[in-house]
C-alpha cells in the first residue's frame, strides 16, 4: 500500500491546484464514507513526510455538512472517496451526503479529487510508477505521429479502422485535473467497421452495475464514427444499449478513441473511473452534444495497430 500511496501523491504534486500554489506544504481535506474509511486513512498515514502536507479527515456519512463545507473552503485540496454506483441505495444524485455539498464542490472543482468506487482497488490503481506511465504514453503518441491509419482487431474476426488525428492528450498523473494516470486519447472522425465488444462500461448510465464485465457478446457496427447497428445474444443488454443510443442522437457519436496504459489496472465492473485506464482500447460514446451522456466501452482484449505496426496485443510493443 505504501508504494501506491507514494505514487498517488506524485500525482497530487502534479495536480494544477498544487502546481499553482508556488509554496511548500498544503492543507488537504480527506473525506470518505464508512466503506472507504480504511483506505482513506491509509492514504493519510502513508503520505511521504517530505511533502509537509497537513490533513483533516471527515467521515462524509456522519459529519455535519455545514462543517464539511467550511473545510472545503479553507483547504488547498479535497480528496473525497466514496461509493456511489455500487451502493444498495443507488441514486442518480449520489449518496445522501453529496447533494448538500454539491454546490460547494462545484464552486471549488479545481481543487477536487474524487475517487468514487475505488475502495480496496486504490492500491491496484496507483501501483505503477507515473514515470513509467508517462514514458509509455510518450512512446505511443510518438508512434501515432509517424502513422496515418489506426486499426483495432477484436480477435473474433471484427475490426475498426480510421485516419489518425495527430491531436492527442496524455493523462500521466501530471498537470491535469484528472490525476488518475494511464491513458492517451484522440478523436478518429472516420472510424468504421464492426466489432464484438467484451469488457465493461463507465458512465452515469449504470451499465456496469447491471452487467459487470461482459464476454464478447455485443456486436457494434460503426460508420463515420457513429454507431449504426447493435445486436446481442443477450436481448436485455441489446435493448438497454439501443435505449441509450436512441435517447439522444449525440449518444451514437464516437467522441473518443482512447488507449489505456496503466499496466496494473484490471476490469471489475464497478463503474469506477480507474477502469478506463485498463490496457487496451476504450471508445467513448456521447457527451459532446447537449443532452447526451458519455459512455466508455472499455475492451477487455484486442489488438491495436498504427498503420501495419502492432502497438498493443495484450502487451505494449512500443
Question: Where are these predicted regions, by residue range?
Answer:
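Active-site and channel-lining beta-strand-loop segments
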Residues: 216-231, 304
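Structural motif
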Residues: 154, 197, 223, 306-307
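A beta-strand-loop signature enriched in Asp, Gly, Thr, and Trp
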Residues: 228-256
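Charge-rich, low-complexity terminal tails
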Residues: 174, 289-318
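Short, glycine-/Ser/Thr-/acidic-enriched flexible segments
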Residues: 35-36, 84-85, 157, 200-202, ...
Amino acid at each position: 500500500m505504501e508504494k501506491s500511496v507514494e505514487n498517488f501523491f506524485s500525482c497530487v504534486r502534479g495536480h494544477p491546484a498544487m502546481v499553482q500554489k508556488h509554496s511548500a506544504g498544503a492543507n488537504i481535506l480527506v473525506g470518505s464514507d464508512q466503506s472507504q474509511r480504511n483506505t482513506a486513512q491509509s492514504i493519510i498515514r502513508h503520505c511521504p513526510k517530505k511533502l509537509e502536507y497537513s490533513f483533516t479527515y471527515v467521515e462524509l456519512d456522519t459529519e455535519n455538512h455545514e462543517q464539511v463545507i467550511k473545510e472545503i473552503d479553507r483547504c488547498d485540496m479535497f480528496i473525497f472517496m466514496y461509493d456511489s454506483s455500487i451502493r444498495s441505495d443507488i441514486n442518480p444524485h449520489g449518496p445522501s451526503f453529496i447533494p448538500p455539498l454539491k454546490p460547494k464542490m462545484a464552486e471549488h472543482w479545481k481543487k477536487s479529487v474524487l475517487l468514487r468506487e475505488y475502495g480496496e482497488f486504490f492500491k491496484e490503481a496507483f501501483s505503477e510508477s507515473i514515470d513509467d506511465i508517462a514514458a509509455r504514453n510518450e512512446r505511443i503518441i510518438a508512434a501515432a505521429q509517424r502513422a496515418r491509419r489506426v486499426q483495432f482487431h477484436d480477435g473474433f474476426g471484427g475490426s475498426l479502422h480510421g485516419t489518425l488525428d495527430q491531436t492527442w492528450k496524455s493523462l500521466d498523473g501530471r498537470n491535469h485535473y484528472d490525476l488518475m494516470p494511464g491513458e492517451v486519447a484522440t478523436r478518429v472522425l472516420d472510424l468504421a467497421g464492426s466489432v464484438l465488444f467484451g469488457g465493461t462500461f463507465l458512465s452515469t448510465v449504470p451499465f456496469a452495475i447491471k452487467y459487470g464485465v461482459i464476454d464478447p457478446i455485443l456486436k457494434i457496427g460503426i460508420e463515420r464514427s457513429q454507431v449504426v447497428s447493435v445486436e446481442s445474444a443477450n436481448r436485455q443488454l441489446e435493448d438497454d444499449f439501443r435505449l441509450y443510443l436512441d435517447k439522444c442522437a449525440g449518444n451514437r457519436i464516437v467522441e473518443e478513441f482512447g488507449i489505456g496504459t496503466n499496466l496494473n489496472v484490471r476490469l471489475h465492473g464497478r463503474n469506477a473511473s480507474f477502469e478506463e485506464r485498463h490496457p487496451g482500447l476504450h471508445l467513448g460514446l456521447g457527451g459532446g452534444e447537449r443532452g447526451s451522456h458519455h459512455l466508455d466501452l472499455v475492451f477487455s482484449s484486442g489488438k491495436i495497430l498504427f498503420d501495419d505496426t502492432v502497438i498493443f496485443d495484450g502487451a505494449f510493443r512500443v
